[in-house]
Amino acid sequence: VEWYGLGPAETYADRKKGAKLGIYENMVKDNMARYMVPQECGAKEEVRWAKVTDRKGRGMLFEMDENNGPMMFSALPYTPHEIENAMHPYELPEVHYTVVRVAKDQMGVGGDDSWGARTHKEYLLKTDKKMEFSFVFKGL
């Protein structure tokens, strides 16, 4: 995975103040945080473009639509369902695909003063407004 956005670590609406805008690269498997209980991880905020390729450079390019501004991007080796249903890392299945998510925004993850802390109001998505989003993707 290569991306032009915030990095190099995962970033969320409430977890990005220490991140720097730049071009970063890692392996899809490296986007899985080593939490004791698998959970949401690996998001990249304020992404202008991202590439997911194999060793030969074949893959997909995802680009923000200039009218929408930067996007949230993630590439993980598991689906959200697989992550949410595993109580321990060893319960995750063998890796056999890459799951890409592209979105206009993603709410914060909370947990800033303890593991049970809810997301602060300013980092929640507005549910009373219509949200539209477009992006471009093409094969490489």
List each language-model region with its residue ranges:
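Beta-strand/loop-rich accessory regions of lumenal/periplasmic or secreted enzymes
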Residues: 1-140
